[in-house]
Amino acid sequence: MTVRPVRRSAVALSAVVAALALAATSPLPSGSAASPLIAGPVPAGTVLHDEHELPDVVPPADIADRDTVSDQLGYARQAASLPVVEPGRAWKNVGPYGQDDPLTYPTGALRFARGAGMGAAAAVDPRDPSGDTVYIGTMGGLWRSTDAGKTYTVLGDGTFARSAIGAVALDPLHPDDVYAGTGISYLTLSGDAPGTGVYVSHDGGKTWSRPASNIKGYGVNAITPTATGVFVGTSNGLYVTTDRGASFRRVALPTNAAHTAPATGAYANWVSSVVVEPSRRRSVTVAVGLAYGKRLGPDGKPLSPGNGLYRSAVGAAGAFTYLAGSRGLTNPEATNDPIGRTSLAYGSSADHPVLWALVQDAGLLNKQQPAGADIVGTTTGRSLNATGTLLNGLYRSDDDGATWTLKATPASLTPTPNEGLGFYPALGYGIGVQAFYNNWIAVDPRDDSNVFFGLEEVFQSVANTGAQPGLGQFEIVQKYWDVCGASTYLENVYAGTACPSQTPVYGGPATHPDQHVGVIARTPKGIRLYTGNDGGFFRQDSHPVRSGRDGFDQDTWQDMNRLASVQPYRVARKPDGEYITALQDNGGGFFKEGGTNTLVTSGDGVFALATSNPDTWYLSAQGAILWITQDHGKTIRDLQPDLVAPQFTSPIVMDPTDENHLVAAAQDVQETVLGPKTTTTLDPVLYTVVATDWASSFDAGASPYKTAAGAVAKWTSQALDVRGAAVYNAMCALCRNALGDPTLIHTTVSTNVGKAGCTPKKASADCWHTAAGKGLPHVAIQAVAIDPTDVKTVYVTLNENSNIGYDKKVVGGQRVMVSHDAGEHFTDLTGNLPRSNARDVLLRNGQLIVATDNGVFTAPRAGGRWSRLGTGLPAVRIYDLSLDKSGRHLTIAAYGRGVWDLDFGAKAVTSSAGAGTGG
């Protein structure tokens, strides 16, 4: 065992546990703070908050490409035109159908309700008086339910060229007309997906068409039917159809700094919300709300100089003007760039339109200090750092946007007892910390002072928040997670303090954090709120709450998550036929075919590694945290490496020839040959690695490249593979630059193979070096696979999404490449493969198999001529390929549609599947 110097941020885990225990065991009066203050950053291994790979990095490049729709549609059509290998073999969706968090497993104490994949969009059918007919959009497709989420019919499969749904709407003038906007654009690396435009159905979703005259843009953020047409807000501006979806045309908005003409920047017309005044349904208001606001782009110009509100009183193209009242969407706690992502909603007051706005602060995302910083910290207690909060505030206008009244700020939104974000501000997080990612608002159609909005949690009014001045009062009705249960979770995993009986004091389980959509349906007895978040969809019918007011509570939410919509980064089939999963924002777990996933670990699941023992497997979370279970998930043990500067998805792999041999990498490469006997000792107070059996084999250190500001860029691992003693580490420099940094990224491999006169050894520094990597393009490597017949031959797949602002001819369009000299030189095998993201690669019986954003493809070792593998896959991104120990079952991670399996019915010699970054 090697004793390690302390590298990570020091914080007393015991203080976290003590605070959790105090918050959990001390009932608090209504309106009081939920927990005592805790000093310091979040403990390195406390994976209870999903960071979404941080917003302050380069988002996918094709967001900025106005031809994204054309590109993605072209990729899909090219994929569909390729011949099919194994045409008689169909892919099978094996599940999981939702996810449970039972108390008998380590994370059960967190008390999450049954969940699924991210809920991104929703619309109710106004013709159904029961409120039960609802359309929901996820990362993996569109579904309709006529029984409030008990059962579903999937829509659009076979027609949607990309199935991630950013918005859905029904036209009340033509109720059978359904509009589905593909593409989700939150400006995160894990939560975004490019689309192929808007699809239209005229029969309630039974059949669909894609108008040739369509939108251009990465994602669809809003679809709003009006009396004059259906407006679509996208990442590339505003569009409208006036012929029931037969065609769409661009609507000009005066988004330059003077508001006299459209701004020309790639991000300058990012429409985050579109609403129509409810009485006549003609006056249309649009929020241009790029989360980054006026941050300078690679060309030195503001990304979005005209964030704010725009209106056409007649709902017509060519009639939109800047709404001067936008300047009122600020307050002393906001920065000088106060308008970022904005959500709008109208109330239905009988005598005048009431407009609400939930506004993210672009300046805070760009790490500016609030304009009134002299009072911050003395009157509000608000953190000035970029992780404290990103929320500007909640506003109400009683004159249709001419003036605004501030109704809530991050400081005024107080947590409730046993609610997870109650102690986060002291750890560097605050309410609204992800307002660029979590941001929606809805108004009670019976009372325009009763408002509901989603950030990390869902809030509702608890007192009249009408036209009178002063801040309103709000309470949380969907909590982040259960503080009392988190204490027990820490006790289970990290020797914390167990929580006593909690239900009598704190009520029912949490649904899930990170709220994306909320819609209201009328019911015979009141209203129903449908919400979508990173854990799926939930519903609740209104009932008397505070002082008889009709609303919602934390305890009676009903899940709607009996569908296969989880978003796996990694999957593996165990010898007993069960599957283990690593899921976006839903941890790691296991399930049987056709069953429900059982949650075992928390955070973002990143890697899942199966062994020959069906009761022993490994699960990892963001930041290279690694656990092992040896009793089928009932208990887990921490055995993480002590990597230098681990990334969100730093790779961890297992040697297919020796499952005791594990390799992990970030800036450095570490190995262990002890498998389940590997131990890692953590400081009980600081939660840092003080001793471990992991040995450092190689530290790539500084690259020869610099950022635009002149800082030396460090190498960091993007992907790994191992076979015997041979290890390849795909490295990247400048892969995660800030948005305004125009520097090209660089990539290569380091390895212990190919050094003259040197024989590689497991867990040894011998022979390690950085290969030349000649021929590699300026894009990130996503996966590595060693040829099982020749360890000097290595295959890589590459990512499309890099280098914003650069011509693709400069960065390179290669997606699959091979080196036959241990990484010194690479040649292109892409051939006729669609040039979307290629995410994973393996070999089976001498055939290459590649996972891409357009499906699974195969070709001979020499590449070039690719075919589709099998039939029946949905149009979603495939993140991972995994062969079971026999080589008979190929299992894939279909992002947004769960786990799929192809049964070859024969054994095979294989390579390891490699391990990339998952995105």
Model regions and ranges:
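Intrinsically disordered, low-complexity segments enriched in polar/charged small residues
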Residues: S9-L13, P27, G401
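Bacterial N-terminal signal peptides
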Residues: S14-A24
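C-terminal region of N-terminal signal peptides and the immediate post-cleavage residues
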Residues: L22-A39, G916-G919
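Low-complexity, Pro/Thr/Ser/Gly/Ala-rich linker/spacer regions in secreted
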Residues: G905-G918
